[in-house]
Amino acid sequence: MITKNKTISKLKRLLFSLLLPAAITTAIPLQAQTCTSKLPCQLRIASYNIQHGVGMDQKLDYKRIADILEGISPDVVAVQEVDSMTRRTGNTYSLGEIADHMRYYASYAPAISFDGGKYGIGILSRKRPIRTEQHALPGREEARTLLVAEFDDYVFAATHLSLTEADLMASISIIENVAKKYDKPFIIAGDLNAQPDSPFIKKFQKSFHICNNKGKSWPADNPRECLDYIAVYKSYGDVRRPG
């Protein structure tokens, strides 16, 4: 399995918080900016790569992750690098453990079989989704997936994209075709494995408005690159940064 050796700390890891009312506000972690959008609801959204629940101290600690998330009180969270019933996590359902601590709903999408169990992505949500669906995405070095959860007022998708540029570019049309199916705001969040000036992000932004401020998010102990994003599908309405 090929993945970046991403780490988390007890008190600091990339956590986008995003408000989606008549305006969109993003903070990472203390900086802020505002965007405008025709959205019917107010949401706080986070994206968190948990590295199978193990922190920079090499300790598996689901409650620590839950505590960090509860500190920003998100409505919905995109979660990456999530184990389910693997030996290295003691045969636990990692997303369910975090959800239990937070009293949230857990939606899981395995991408590959690994270490006696599964490895993939998930969504934690304050409200129960109306429905969820999973879509395969290109991944030459490792299978990738898109998890979509529909709620009353919006649709939320979580993903962790490939490290390969060709796979990244091929993923855009798949994600866009999924977004087109819905007549409500479609929001996507996750680890896109691409920097803001990359060909992928430039093409991605033709269909999706990136709402976070593109602050550096990786590696956690000394962030040098922006790889994590929250974005809204543009076809729903006008989404722009004022000024």
Predicted regions span which residues?
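Structured beta-strand-rich core segments of catalytic domains in phosphoester-bond hydrolases
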Residues: 35, 57-58, 82-154, 242-243
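Active-site-proximal beta-strand elements of phosphoester/diester hydrolases
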Residues: 42-54, 133, 148-162
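Metal-dependent phosphoester-hydrolase catalytic domains
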Residues: 34-35, 134-135, 167, 177-187, ...
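Bacterial N-terminal signal peptides
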Residues: 15-27
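Catalytic metal-binding/acid-base residues of hydrolase active sites
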Residues: 51, 83, 162, 192-195
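Alpha-helical elements of Rossmann-like donor-binding domains used by nucleotide-donor carbohydrate transfer enzymes
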Residues: 63-68, 97, 148, 173-178, ...
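N-terminal, active-site-proximal structural segment of metallo-dependent hydrolase catalytic domains
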Residues: 2, 7-14, 28-101, 113-115, ...
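Active-site flanking residues adjacent to catalytic metal/cofactor-binding acidic residues
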Residues: 48, 80, 159, 189-191
